[in-house]
């Protein structure tokens, strides 16, 4: 299954989707895999090599690796470019896992 199909399949569920945009040459590449491994049971994760999958990167307006996009269905909830610490990602995931977009805050 290709990257686009993986993203579309993940967007059909109610689960959070974390897109991890990377480049093999990036000096940050080495710490991305442990991060992905830690969170793969909590959210759907799709890794996107920005050089190989330029069309997907362009869709999300990604220019720099690493970049991260957290979304549910078609709604982008959070974005980050650059170094990402596990605690930071953990907090963001927990916040949005408990967030219900259908609750009105009047």
What are these regions (language model features)?
Residues 1-15, 91-106:
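N-terminal leader/targeting and pre-domain segments
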Residues 69-105:
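Non-catalytic, surface beta->alpha helical segment in thiol-disulfide oxidoreductase systems
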Residues 2-39:
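Local sequence-structure signature of Cys/Sec-based thiol-disulfide redox active-site neighborhoods
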Residues 3-10, 59-63, 67:
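Membrane-targeting and insertion segments and their boundary/processing signals
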Residues 27-28, 52-55, 87:
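Short alpha-helical
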Residues 56-65, 71-77:
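Structural alpha/beta surface segment adjacent to cysteine/selenocysteine redox centers
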Residues 1, 21-22, 37-56, 62-64:
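Thiol-based oxidoreductase modules, predominantly thioredoxin-like and allied folds used
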